[in-house]
Structure formats: C-alpha cells, structure tokens
Amino acid sequence: MPLRIKLTHRGPLIGSPELRFNAGLLFGGTIPKLHNDDVEFSFGWGGAATGDTSLAFLKTMAVAKDVNEFMSTMETMTAEKGYRGMAANIIMADNSGNIAYQQAVPMFRRKDETPYLGCRVLDGRTSEFDWTDEIVPLTELPRAINPEKGFISNANNRQAPDNASKDYGATQMSTGRSVRIDEMIRQGIDSGKKFTADDMIAI
C-alpha cells in the first residue's frame, strides 16, 4: 500500500496521531491544542538542505595538520553557503596539545532575526516565521579553542549559556549527564590521575 506524504515549502506535513503525540511530548508546552485532530504540522529540518558536504568535512578532519588548520578550513568551506552536513558536536585535538570544540549544524536564519532558530512550533499560516536561504555561520555557533578548564566534553548537551542570543535547539537536554562527566574528569585531574582509554569508556 503506497504511503502518501503531503509536502509544503517548509517540509512534510505531520498529521498522524502517533506523530502528533510524539511532537506533543517534545513541544507540548509551546502551542495550544497540539492534539487537535484538525491540526497538521509542517516539519522543517536543516539537515534536508541540498548540497550536503558531510563527506568533505570528514575528509578535512582526516587531513588537517592541527586544530587551527581544521577550524580555519571549516570556516573557509562554509563562508559562502554555510555548513550543509550532518549535525555534529566536533571535538578535536592535535599533537601540540591544542583542543577545540565546534558545534556544526545547518541552522537557517529566520526573517527579521527572530529568536526562534531552533526546534519550536510556530504559526504556519503565515510566512512570518519562515527560514531565509542563509545558514548561520559556524563562527556564530558554540565553539571553544583551548578552554581555560583544560578539557572539553560533550554529551549532546546545551553548549550555550542561558542568555545566548540564539535558540540552539530543543533536543539538547543531556546537560545533567554532561555535568556529571565534567565532575568525574575534574576529580581525576585534581587527584593527579593520568586518564586512559579504559577510563574514558568507564566514564
């Protein structure tokens, strides 16, 4: 039996009770009447943008000589059309001891620079909240080079402060897990521990 999918300029329509229920779990507090049978949602996803460059970025990661080269190459590659690839939290290190983090995600700007740049349900009856064709540059996304604390960890958690000018997404809810990872690493550092691969697996 063929599956009929309705498409809009924003993306496919989500109309099934199951999909609406799952959307309600994530976005239920943001709009009224989420479970109304007459409501359909168009689902926009930056990862569906044309011109995926994921493989090119993976190659860049593999051949970069150091952290600075990798970061500058990424900026150059995305200067014109923005980052168009799989969403990723990229953590890197080089032989000189430099470390860095870059959030890489195809995040489109909205008209009038509204703060709703992440996963939010908005009124689709108007084009007011539509994306523009511009992707937010990597330099405006969360990043760090040689942070003062001396290490970088990530557990798909929120990387931006609460007063950040942009909404970086509703799905990065693992902050508690990340805090615990940081605690365990700090405890090891304070005790003079030399971490091994097995230690990282245990954490």
Give, region by region, the residue ranges found by the protein language model.
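Mature extracytoplasmic enzyme cores
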Residues: 1-203
